[in-house]
Amino acid sequence: MHFILDPEDPGAPQASTEGKPKHRRLRGGVVMAAPPARPDHTRLLQICLLLGVLVEIRAEQILYSVFEEQEEGSVVGNIAKDLGLAPRELAERGVRIVSRGRTQLFALNPRSGTLVTAGRIDREELCDRSPNCVTNLEILLEDTVKILRVEVEIIDVNDNPPSFGTEQREIKVAENENPGARFPLPEAFDPDVGVNSLQGYQLNSNGYFSLDVQSGADGIKYPELVLERALDREEEAVHHLVLTAFDGGDPVRSGTARILIILVDTNDNAPVFTQPEYHVSVRENVPVGTRLLTVKATDPDEGANGDVTYSFRKVRDKISQLFQLNSLSGDITILGGLDYEDSGFYDIDVEAHDGPGLRARSKVLVTVLDENDNAPEVTVTSLTSSVQESSSPGTVIALFNVHDSDSGGNGLVTCSIPDNLPFTLEKTYGNYYRLLTHRTLDREEVSEYNITVTATDQGTPPLSTETHISLQVMDINDNPPTFPHASYSAYIPENNPRGASILSMTAQDPDSGDNARITYSLAEDTFQGAPLSSYVSINSNTGILYALCSFDYEQFRDLQLLMTASDSGDPPLSSNVSLSLFVLDQNDNVPEILYPTFPTDGSTGVELAPRSADSGYLVTKVVAVDRDSGQNAWLSYSLLKSSEPGLFAVGLHTGEVRTARALLDRDALKQRLVVVVQDHGQPPLSATVTLTVAVADSIPDVLADLGSLKPSADPDDSGLTLYLVVAVAAVSCVFLAFVTVLLALKLRRWHKSRLLHAEGSRLAGVPASHFVGVDGVRAFLQTYSHEVSLTADSRKSHLIFSQPSYADTLISRESCEKSEPLLITQDLLETKGDPNLQQAPPNTDWRFSQAQRPGTSGSQNGDDTGTWPNNQFDTEMLQAMILASASEAADGSSTLGGGAGTMGLSARYGPQFTLQHVPDYRQNVYIPGSNATLTNAAGKRDGKAPAGGNGNKKKSGKKEKK
């Protein structure tokens, strides 16, 4: 068994900063302290018994000491060495500190085997002011399951200065306190112990107080303040002292507190006036309440001892009625009116006293000065309260008299009025004055005058009296109503509801009453044959303009009005203002299709396209206009429906129908297109047109395809019944046979004409062709009123607008009376000598260039062996045949043929249509393929040969327009 003993010497050994233990550890026995030199037996026995007890108590216990506030990791002691173990054996034997669930102040270094601090240790926090501060910890040896108790003593360091509970202490001391009086001072506190604790106090040097420190039975020191000599508050009211507390550490630490000695006043001083006598002069007319002067007495005491109050001494009734003394401020004010004639001098005794009753006296001498104390008086004897604005200058407004009770210069009075008024003062006799108008008055500038008449004497200072005269200016009707602007503009959308408010017109009249009461009216006039009152009306009282009808922008776009504003004066005055009423366009008109036109029988026109056409080939062009204006009239074209999707495309802005790809043999002869034209209004309006395109490469192909032409597959026809299909097929077969016979006759006639031409005979001219419809319905050829550019480059071009020119419909009564079913021509020889019947030379301006000719995009030569017809006769015959055949094959009726006014063919191959019911838009059209206008075309119809009409007819790819 091992025993560890502490020395018996009461003076414990000092622990070093290295944390060396303050004991020796022995193995196998108990070390006992050496006895004294000559101990007696009793003392020796007591020591042995005590050591035996200590051996049992202190067995397996180690004591260390360490200073507080050391850094973390500071060495406290070497556990391994004290246990007789090597540092590596600590881990092998499982040596560790047993935790008790609280913060550990120490830790075991496993490498060195030393006990170190786990953090900063504050002794004052652990043990407060206890003289001994010891903390215990237990070390477990796991291999032997033994507990080793370790005690660590925390040694105090001087880390806290003395401090006072308050930084400043106020002590009140009476200024008459006797020397030797004691006053307790605040105590300081130092949490350190021993020599590091509070050791004493110091007081800064001063001539009135000293410091005496008393020690109590518990050893605590109590500082006291001792008065050394008499005090005087008036000399020094506050004394500032500094009390310092210090400890005995090294270095010495200290704390301070400010001591404020406030002297309490005693009434040891009487009030004293600043002057033994006060002199003052005052004018007799000084107003009541005027401060005359202020008497002042001072008292150096404080509080009630220094509060001075004032009063009159031996006051007489006369003085108490004329003067008043403020007891607190010492102000003497005028209580009653002073009169120099009554008394010119006053002698007043004034007394000052403090709270306890000490007094002082002084005199106030008042001299009264004579003054101009009477103001002039103004008496109005005659007055006019109103005057008309048309009154002439010099009109009398008032008559008054002035008077002043003073004498001498104080009684001389002069009168005046402001300079900016249209009035003047005229002195008559004595002290009488007249108030007159200086110029003509204008009520619209100033309707009421407040005239101030000032009467002033010549005293020092001068006194004056003001008299106010009120004058009303009566109105006359001298101003007509006026509008803020010389003219007005108003805007109203078309299709407005009846009774809609358009504009509110307001006129101003600076007059008053009936002269300013305004009525509004419109000047009588007519517009488009109707009075203006049928279009608009105006409220005579409010000036609000109303619409009596719904306006139409397409009928008129503006309306000029003249508005009159009249007052109710006598005579009445008036003024006029012009109003321009503009009608704003609304999108209320759908686009109108100009080409192709809609025949009266409901059929659609036929456009021709050769099968050899490449992609981008111009088939036709849709022309439309919109009656609206601006954005509402901007049109765009699009393809709504097509019997062969992807075959055709429509120009968005031009309306040109072009092939989107090259035509193939499998493409049907008849192609049906639905083109929609839409404007850009809000909401947009649109119109649709149905086009029928016949696809063929040559005349034989056309004739061959006509027999096998089938109606295009249309989802809308899926509902036709079987009997309708059979009927249409039967009619088509009969009609095809008729057309075949008719075509043979026409070919024979054509061959005959070619033989005559070959023999060199000069043709007298071919008259205008006359046609009668197949079923007795006339097919009238009508000259274009609107043409579209259909050149090869028209995809990039736009519409060109020409001057309007109507062409009459050409009708031949003779052709109607002939028995020939289709065509009767006059004898060519009979017309040879008639110059009026001679055919005009072909106009080269109407011809297509070689690149524009039909067929394979103008690649064919212009010889007589060409595929397409080379004269007007053949072309007209081909058109009639295609018209009849395509109509019967497609619809079972004359839907493909031309109704009244059209032959149903494209503009490229000479379509004609009537625009009798369409507005005149001819200024928007030019003749395709030509620089000529419609006027030139009209001249051509009259038989006049145009310039350049001697071109080669064989090279023309287009027949001459009729």
UniProtKB/Swiss-Prot annotation:
Q: Where is the composition biased (Polar residues)?
A: 836-871
- Which residue ranges have biased composition labelled Basic residues? 952-962
Q: Which Pfam families does the record cross-reference, listed alphabetically?
A: Cadherin (PF00028), Cadherin_2 (PF08266), Cadherin_C_2 (PF16492), Cadherin_tail (PF15974)
Renumbered to this chain, the signal peptide range is 1-59
Which organism is this entry from? Answer: Homo sapiens
Gene symbol of the encoding locus:
PCDHGA4
Q: Which residues cross the membrane?
A: 724-744
Name of the protein in its database record = Protocadherin gamma-A4
Chain intervals for the UniProt region annotation (Disordered)? 1-24, 832-871, 932-962
What functional role does this protein have?
Potential calcium-dependent cell-adhesion protein. May be involved in the establishment and maintenance of specific neuronal connections in the brain.
Compartments annotated for it: namely: Cell membrane
* PROSITE patterns assigned: CADHERIN_1, CADHERIN_2
